[in-house]
């Protein structure tokens, strides 16, 4: 089963490029809103790092989500797309002074703080602007996630967050400061997580920490559990919308949320992953000693995930219905790691065929680079190509 694409329109465009199916995106956003409506205390922020294409951001903002940003540039992108500043949260282990000042100037909802030195800088910069900054502390819960090692973020060995044993001390420091207001706790254990048991483990850890704080009569208004929900890379046509029902229900059943608390989520991949495809043209079919190579005009500069994470993306020859043959699908970049997949079954490939690399809406266009002096790929939505 292949995806449905406007192939005639594609033939008029310079490849490679990203294509975003806005129906899939809107269906995904609708599914999220349908589930979140069951839980009045839930609030969802879109993780801008997954995809900051302005046309994509605008559709997401129209759904009512907030924005989760990890740089000053992302804050600007979110504001340009119309996200209200009071629905923007700012995370990241290394926030520069100008980025903190930018967040203060816009009046964003919250800074997710990852160290005492960062807290001290935020307090100092807020004082200079005569403002009080809302802060939540990102706690490293030492919870592992069943995902690639490079995208785990909740283990003690990771660079992210404040260790659990330091939580009390950091909160005490914040409570003595005049220009920061401690409002919450933040967690994020990793990305592309499909095992709900990982989220249950996080809930158990959050419950423990909440009990500990309440014993000290410290009440926390906001709990932010990050995101991490994965997508089905193997079956983008069969499961284009992730299982948000199970995801949100897991937290409803396992997290002991207090009546006065708001629970925040930061979803990225699960929002945009399945709506995007990288469209590439076959330059050559090369017969090697033991295998055939399909050489594309897209490479690791356009979609780095296979080279960086050994990630799998389903590939489809969308211009051929001939019998399947096995190919190593590679790009033109001068790196041996510029390989999208080995022994991939595709309908017989010829020069000029269009290959769609599916489930590329997240961490695709946004991570593209100009290595080898290549131009960045453009992004088009289905709304544009009607």
Predicted regions and their residues:
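A charged N-terminal "starter" segment
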Residues: 1-133, 172-181, 211-218, 345, ...
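Charged (often Lys/Glu-rich) extended helix/loop segments that serve as interaction or gating elements
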Residues: 3-4, 260-386
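Conserved, mostly hydrophobic/aromatic
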Residues: 25, 49, 71, 103, ...
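Hydrophobic "anchor" residues on beta-strands that sit immediately upstream
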Residues: 45, 134, 222, 262, ...
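Active-site beta-loop-alpha junctions enriched in small/polar residues
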Residues: 47-53, 70-73, 93-95, 114-116, ...
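Short acidic, glycine/serine/threonine-rich loops at helix termini
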Residues: 57, 80, 100-105, 122-125, ...
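Active-site loop/helix belt of alpha/beta enzymes
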Residues: 142-284, 346, 372
